[in-house]
């Protein structure tokens, strides 16, 4: 039997709390030296702050423009925009609240992400806070156990076909990032990818309706309260409004803006399953969505609607979320017990409703 290689734990210097920007073309088509350099930079950024920005990952500006056209809530071109369709059409594909994988439409306030922090990861008392967010979730086109809930084709022609294609493209891009993380952490090739090749991942379109600043400042409703995602990694595309913030690793409870960049810039954050696999060597990126930076000093007025799209790369349901042996030593014993990814996900998601 081959000997398990221990991963060296590096003490992280946190002088720069913001995510780095890495060019994935170096990993896609670069030399072995360039691939290694990309992987090291990728790991350095997520180790520091739980986040990294990725460019030239294979999803074009034009494709992301088309993606955001489907996310609009304006009624100008209603049959091309999901969030503008009639409420009864959304209710026809509503996501049933509960711990099963999310499929279909969730209304504003349906999910309480703040409850995901009930394990003491934050000191904020937000257990009943609600989200000013509606979203549409789709699973893998090949998922027959939990099939996606699609609006009738006559209601929004082409919506299903586009999102199913975008799901496949996003999954490929996310697996590329995971492959680079394997390399940057000196793990055996495929040890993480092999756990994420199934149909457990999810694609989410987000719409944050226009809202008064005063309402957000009262604290019982937020665009998204502080939380960590439950999967392996999240690949996010955001519009130009801003409001996404990550927690400063050296100052718990303090948050820093993650401003939008180029149209196709992909913001990648480490999620809880990755933290479990690495036995807390790489920890999940805590984040929130709040008032855009340029409006922070205002006490009144309205914040425009915000849109984003997240691809949640998740482990196969039967994959273990226990720490990999490469991250377990006598000095760093396993911090998490054996559990399947599906059981872990359902246990955690049940707290959000």
Swiss-Prot record:
Listed GO biological process terms: alkaloid metabolic process; small molecule biosynthetic process
UniProt entry keywords in alphabetical sequence: Alkaloid metabolism, Dioxygenase, Iron, Metal-binding, Oxidoreductase
Top EC category: oxidoreductase
UniProt remark on cofactor binding: Binds 1 Fe(2+) ion per subunit.
Organism expressing this protein natively: Penicillium fellutanum
Pathway(s) served: Alkaloid biosynthesis
A GO molecular-function descriptor: metal ion binding
Enzyme Commission code(s) on record: 1.14.11.-
TM segment ranges: none
Cofactors required: Fe(2+)
Task of the protein: 2-oxoglutarate-dependent dioxygenase; part of the gene cluster that mediates the biosynthesis of paraherquamide, a fungal indole alkaloid that belongs to a family of natural products containing a characteristic bicyclo[2.2.2]diazaoctane core. The first steps in the biosynthesis of paraherquamide is the production of the beta-methyl-proline precursor from L-isoleucine. They require oxidation of a terminally hydroxylated L-isoleucine to the corresponding aldehyde by enzymes which have still to be identified.
Keyword presence, Iron: yes
Keyword Metal-binding listed: yes
Family according to the record: Belongs to the iron/ascorbate-dependent oxidoreductase family.
Domain Fe2OG dioxygenase residues, every copy: 199-315
Primary gene name: phqC
The protein's name in its UniProt record: 2-oxoglutarate-dependent dioxygenase phqC
Residues reported in the UniProt entry to bind Fe cation: 227, 229, 287
Binding site for 2-oxoglutarate: 302
């Amino acid at each position: 039997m081959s000997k398990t290689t221990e991963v060296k734990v590096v003490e992280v210097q946190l002088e720069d709390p913001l995510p780095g920007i890495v060019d994935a073309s170096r990993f896609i088509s670069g030399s072995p030296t360039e691939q290694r350099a990309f992987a090291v930079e990728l790991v350095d950024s997520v180790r520091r702050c739980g986040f990294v920005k990725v460019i030239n990952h294979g999803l074009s500006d034009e494709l992301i423009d088309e993606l955001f056209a489907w996310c609009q809530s304006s009624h100008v071109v209603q049959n091309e925009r999901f969030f503008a369709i009639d409420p009864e059409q959304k209710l026809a594909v509503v996501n049933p609240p509960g711990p099963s994988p999310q499929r279909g439409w969730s209304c504003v306030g349906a999910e309480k992400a703040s409850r995901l922090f009930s394990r003491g990861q934050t000191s904020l008392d937000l257990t009943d806070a609600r989200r000013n967010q509606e979203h549409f979730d789709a699973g893998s086109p090949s998922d027959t156990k939990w099939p996606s809930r699609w609006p009738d084709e006559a209601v929004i022609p082409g919506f299903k076909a586009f999102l199913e294609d975008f799901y496949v493209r996003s999954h490929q891009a996310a697996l590329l990032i995971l492959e680079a993380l394997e390399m940057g952490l000196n793990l055996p090739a495929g040890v993480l990818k092999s756990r994420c090749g199934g149909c457990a991942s999810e694609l989410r379109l987000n719409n944050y309706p226009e809202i008064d600043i005063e309402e957000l400042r009262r604290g019982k409703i937020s665009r998204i309260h502080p939380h960590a995602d439950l999967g392996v990694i999240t690949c996010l595309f955001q519009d130009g409004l801003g409001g996404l913030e990550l927690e400063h690793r050296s100052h718990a409870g303090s948050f820093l803006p993650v401003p939008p960049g180029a149209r196709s810039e992909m913001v990648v954050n480490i999620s809880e399953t990755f933290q479990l696999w690495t036995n807390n060597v790489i920890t999940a990126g805590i984040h929130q969505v709040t008032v855009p930076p340029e409006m922070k000093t205002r006490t009144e007025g309205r914040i425009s609607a915000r849109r984003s799209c997240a691809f949640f790369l998740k482990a196969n349901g039967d994959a273990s979320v226990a720490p990999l042996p490469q991250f377990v030593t006598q000095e760093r014993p396993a911090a998490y017990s054996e559990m399947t990814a599906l059981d872990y996900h359902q246990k955690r998601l049940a707290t959000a409703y």
